[in-house]
């Protein structure tokens, strides 16, 4: 069994003008208390005559996303970058995400930062922090050596 903390998430904070761009990443971990991954799959369902009334399913698309939440740590490079996008629109929200899983996979994908929250909570709490990182396009998945 692998604990959730054994996974690593990096957010692209700057990129070169090369094509494709080369990203500089910052680890998004300080203050982070919860991470969830959703495939957001699109499924086509067919009921064929030979299925005797039971469906056949094909996954035909996906819009993967990471939902991240925790406490705001001002001065942390990754959180500060995400926070700077709170009121940005359009391509100003675009970035890259790199995920290294506890199972030894590295996932890299263009991404969009959404639903940024940099404050809130009970009056005695540290400010909350959360965002959704929407993957754009097909991720590159490789084995970590």
Q: Which ranges hold each PLM region?
A:
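Solvent-exposed edge beta-strands and adjacent loop segments
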Residues: 1-73, 112-127
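Homeobox/homeodomain signature
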Residues: 25-27, 97-99, 103, 119, ...
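Compositionally biased, intrinsically disordered low-complexity segments
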Residues: 35-38, 100, 129, 144
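Short, surface-exposed linear patches
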Residues: 58-59, 88-94, 119-122, 134-136
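Beta-strand secondary-structure signal
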Residues: 65-69, 96-98, 110, 130-134
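Acidic glycine-/aspartate-rich tracts in secreted/extracellular proteins
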Residues: 72-75, 138
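Short, acidic/charged, Gly/Pro-enriched secondary-structure junctions
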Residues: 78-110
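Mixed-charge, glycine-accented linear interaction segment located at domain edges/termini
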Residues: 109-145
């Amino acid at each position: 069994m692998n604990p959730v903390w054994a996974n690593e998430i990096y957010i692209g904070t700057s990129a070169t003008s090369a094509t494709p761009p080369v990203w500089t990443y910052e680890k998004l971990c300080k203050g982070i208390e919860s991470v969830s991954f959703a495939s957001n799959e699109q499924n086509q369902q067919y009921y064929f005559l030979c299925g005797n009334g039971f469906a056949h399913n094909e996954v035909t698309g996906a819009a993967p996303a990471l939902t991240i939440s925790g406490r705001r740590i001002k001065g942390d490079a990754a959180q500060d970058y995400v926070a700077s996008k709170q009121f940005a629109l359009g391509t100003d929200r675009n970035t890259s995400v790199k995920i290294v899983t506890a199972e030894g996979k590295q996932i890299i994908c263009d991404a969009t930062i959404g639903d940024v929250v940099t404050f809130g909570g009970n009056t005695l709490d540290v400010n909350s922090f959360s965002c959704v990182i929407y993957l754009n396009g097909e991720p590159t998945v490789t084995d970590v050596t």
